[in-house]
Swiss-Prot record:
Residues 34-43, 67-92 have a biased composition (Low complexity). GO terms for biological process: anaphase-promoting complex-dependent catabolic process; cell division; positive regulation of anaphase-promoting complex-dependent catabolic process; protein ubiquitination. Component of the anaphase promoting complex/cyclosome (APC/C), a cell cycle-regulated E3 ubiquitin-protein ligase complex that controls progression through mitosis and the G1 phase of the cell cycle. GO terms for cellular component: anaphase-promoting complex; phagocytic vesicle. This is Anaphase-promoting complex subunit cdc20. Its main location: nucleus. GO terms for molecular function: anaphase-promoting complex binding; ubiquitin ligase activator activity. The keyword Nucleus applies. Residues 28-92 are annotated as: Disordered. The APC/C is composed of at least 13 subunits that stay tightly associated throughout the cell cycle: anapc1, anapc2, anapc3, anapc4, anapc5, anapc6, anapc7, anapc8, anapc10, anapc11, cdc20, cdc26 and cdh1. It comes from Dictyostelium discoideum (Social amoeba). Pfam families: WD40_CDC20-Fz. InterPro entries: Cdc20/Fizzy (IPR033010), WD40/YVTN_repeat-like_dom_sf (IPR015943), WD40_CDC20-Fz (IPR056150), WD40_repeat_CS (IPR019775), WD40_repeat_dom_sf (IPR036322), WD40_rpt (IPR001680).
Amino acid sequence: MNSNYETAELEQLLSLNAPLENVEARWQRKARQNNSNTNNNNGNNGGDRFIPNKMNIDIGHFNLTKENSNPNPNAINNNSSTSTSTTATSSTTNNIESTLYKDTLANQLFESNSGDLESKILSFKSKAPVGNVSSSTNSLRVLYSQNQVGSTPTDQSLKKQFRQIPQQPERILDAPDIVDDYYLNLLDWSSQNVIAIPLGQTVYLWNATTSEIQRLFQVEQQDDYITSLQWTKDGNYLAVGTNSCTIQLWDVAHTKKVRELRGHAGRVGALAWNDYILSSGSSDTNIFNHDVRVQNHHVSTLSGHSQEVCGLKWSHDGGQLASGGNDNIINIWDINSENFETPAHTFEQHTAAVRALAWCPFQPNLLATGGGAADRTIRFWNTITGVCLNTVDTMSQVCSIQWSTTYRELVSSHGYSQNQLCVWKYPSMVKCAELTGHTSRALHTAISPDGETVVSASADETLRFWRVFEKENKLPTANRKSKEVSDGSMMRNINSLIR
């Protein structure tokens, strides 16, 4: 009895079983200690850089040395009456010198802040994102989800700049007996999705929708051959230039020659339509404008070249005609000027023949031109002011240029040594892709009506189809591969027909 009573009394005195009140948990004490240490270590200024304040040491050392070197030991006693005023004056002087020293040092370190000692060296503005993180969620997952590429409009625009361009052609067709001549224009793609190309003495039509092939006509004379061709805007008629100095107009739907235009004294190597006006460039150095509606079709002659005219292009609004020649000259003819038969501008910066001409579809009065093997440059011109806006050295002969109607880009075809197609981003002229495969120079290019595919015709006797400007949200990859397989079988049949 006594022992049990004594044990109960002892437990009551020690209160071993009673819970402790108003006692902080261990993690709370640790957090409070860390906060107190952090507050003690922080300076009053709260800046992110510490500069020691030692600028008064030299002044103090000077004063001590001056006092110790005083030859009169009684000077201190004699001047005891003025010690108070001397101390005040010295303190004021020290403060002024200290301020000047601070300002000088601050101006050297903080030039942009004009001596603001409270300014920070580094400024961190973009903070890590904060999400609703529960106890069971990894906190780093919030950072990963918030900082993925494409989460902001800027990232999305950067992502679009680096789109995928297929490096292999989508289709390859045989083009036997195509003429290997830099000064001719032998390929065009109509608005009805039909490609026209002369092989030998025969003009062939290939329907890109149905994959059907058609022989349009063959020249009659044995020594004659096709030198140029151009579709009308609606795709119903085809103009064909020949080595016999004539131009033939064909109704494709009825496979019928509508008329024949004469007048040139040399082969017709370049053609360009502007509504019912057909412009033709010849090796006789002249450009003829024909009104195909009337019997007397020849309406004007443009004489501005001294050698063969090998490039002709009307602007999209029909107001200007660009011509390039073997004399390395580009002429701009303004139809709205009082004297249309005199070039509004003449550009002589190219050092080789100029056949590659292309008007920009999204910026008026912007013309891209390409020079031959001795020049190798692409130049951009403002055809109103006559100023050369930019020049890019492509390191190879420029055969043709095509602008994209979907992107702010253009594609150029080249000769020796790579025989490649280059895709450029405008206006930076950064090379987006380089498409190789031709074993000889890619003389001609044309773009499809939907603006996605570029076809190239080469002296290696092949046609290659490149899906360069593919639009977004297209068919899945599996469907596209199955389509390519079916197209491949069609191509073999077409090649056998051509052969």
